[in-house]
Design a protein with these regions (language model features):
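Short glycine-enriched, charge-decorated loop/helix-capping segments at active-site entrances
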Residues: 21-27, 77-78
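Conserved alpha/beta core of the MobA/IspD/sugar-nucleotide pyrophosphorylase nucleotidyltransferase superfamily
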Residues: 2, 153-194
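Short catalytic helix/loop segments, enriched in acidic residues and glycine
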Residues: 24-37
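Conserved N-terminal catalytic core of the sugar/cofactor nucleotidyltransferase
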Residues: 35-98, 154
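A short, conserved beta-strand element in the Rossmann-like catalytic core
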Residues: 16, 59, 107-108
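Residue-level signal for inorganic ion chemistry
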Residues: 8, 34, 49, 88, ...
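Conserved beta-loop-beta/alpha segment of the NTase-like Rossmann-fold superfamily
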Residues: 78-145
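N-terminal nucleotide-binding beta1-loop-alpha1 segment
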Residues: 1-19
Length: 194
């Protein structure tokens, strides 16, 4: 059986959020955003969950303390999202056959969507799996270990895995969950979440 790691990128400052509270600790329906994002991941059946933290590391570590996650601190988080992606993939490389790359600000993902992505990855273990909703590419994506090295070589700045998808190609997986397109970048996104 293939081992699956979930890598949650939660290191950024959330500078577009424009609030007096750190974005990932802002309540979404009464629960801090990072925990709302984590809930379906915990229920989806991953072998390991890695949370990459950076900005507000102490507060993030404290809130994640009681959860079965491995915390990786990205001290280079100011250099862009790709540094968190790199830190998370490196952490997953030793213990997983594939990594599901999640954004910490996607609090509306459903457990069923994550399980469906894992099932698709079981059917196509050598392919990158990318969710699409109504023809639009979303997140999270699942990357097999055979692409880890290529992903690490291609990522820089805030480009994340887009270069890998362009270069290596991917399998389109249609889902009925609009949450794959929704992350919270601004206060306006929060107001419109309902």
């Amino acid at each position: 059986m293939l081992k699956s790691a979930a890598v949650i990128q939660a290191a950024g400052k959330g500078s577009r959020f424009h609030s007096n509270q750190y974005k990932l600790l802002t309540p979404v329906d009464g629960v801090p955003m990072i925990l709302r994002t984590l809930e379906p991941v915990l229920d989806a059946g991953f072998d390991e969950i890695i949370v990459v933290i950076g900005a507000h590391a102490d507060a993030m570590r404290q809130i994640l303390l009681d959860y079965p996650v491995r915390i990786i601190e990205n001290k280079n988080w100011k250099k862009g999202q790709s540094t968190s992606l790199t830190a998370g993939v490196r952490a997953a490389a030793n213990s997983s056959d594939r990594a599901c790359l999640l954004l910490g600000d996607q609090p509306f993902l459903k457990t069923e969507t994550l399980q469906a992505l894992l099932d698709e990855a079981d059917r196509f273990p050598e392919e990158i799996i990318v969710p699409f909703y109504e023809g639009k590419r979303g997140n999270p994506i699942i990357v097999p270990a055979c692409f880890y090295e290529q992903l690490l070589e291609l990522t820089k700045g805030d480009e994340g895995g887009k270069k890998l998808l362009k270069e290596a190609g991917y399998r389109v997986f249609s889902v009925e969950d609009s949450a794959v397109l929704r992350d919270i970048d601004t206060m306006e996104d929060m107001k419109n979440h309902g």
